[in-house]
Design a protein with these regions (language model features):
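ABC ATP-binding cassette signature C-motif
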Residues: 1-228
Length: 228
């Protein structure tokens, strides 16, 4: 609960291997809280969470990894190693960074000289080196340029593990998830098969927007559509 408002209430579900789930709803309704509960970073006030065996989790949150400013792109990603292991195969770091749109001559550039979009690509390159079968991403599309957004989308489409994704980007959600957890702002979560467009067509987003109004907030004359 937060300020006497329950963010996740009486939610029971089963996540299967390979599920691709998008968490949608207005800001502050408990999406990040639920992710932290599932990851064991927070403890529930009631109920329990059971996890499967042999879970390997990679977590990308809104704060992002802190990059070492004076180190190069390559050294930030590999801790100074020349080779990385990707899907069981050894690759040279220069070739791997090419997958993230860094030309060879750019790989030795200090992070402090990078643009915001390049920094995001460095963090994604670090993330996808982690062996995982559960990928948890909290607002990964924030501050991404178009090239990096397309790169991330391709990576997630190719990912064959379980995905839990929080994002306000409707098209991105439609392209990478197969089911939704929709937060209504009162602690209740609805489960729906399909992406954001499927849910919106079936239920009408304006209804969810009304439910998601913050406690104590007065209704506006005209209700906006819900934002994921």
């Amino acid at each position: 609960a937060w300020k006497d408002v329950s963010q996740v209430n009486d939610f029971s579900t089963l996540v299967m291997r390979g599920d691709r789930i998008g968490l949608v709803g207005p800001n502050g309704v408990g999406k990040s809280t639920l992710l932290k509960l599932l990851l064991g970073k927070l403890q529930p006030q009631s109920g329990n969470i059971r996890t499967g065996t042999k879970l390997e989790v990679a977590y990308f949150d809104q704060s992002r990894d802190v990059l070492e400013e004076d180190k190069s792109i390559a050294d930030n990603v590999t801790d100074g190693k020349d080779h990385v292991v990707v899907n069981g195969q050894s690759r040279h770091v220069i070739g791997y960074l090419g997958d993230f749109l860094f030309p060879p001559e750019r790989a030795r550039t200090p992070v402090k000289a990078l643009s915001g979009g390049e920094r995001n690509r460095v963090m994604l390159a670090k993330l996808f080196l982690k062996p995982c079968n559960l990928l948890v991403m909290d607002e990964p599309t924030n501050d991404l340029d178009i090239e990096t957004l397309e790169l991330l989308e391709e990576r997630l489409i190719d990912f064959d593990g379980t995905l839990l994704l929080v994002s306000h980007d409707r098209a991105f959600i439609d392209n990478v998830v197969t089911q939704l957890w929709v937060f209504d702002g009162s602690g209740h979560i609805d489960e729906h098969v399909g992406g954001y467009s499927d849910w919106h067509e079936r239920t009408g987003g304006h209804k969810k927007a009304q439910k998601a109004e913050a406690p104590g907030q007065k209704s506006a004359d005209k209700k906006p559509e819900a934002q994921p």
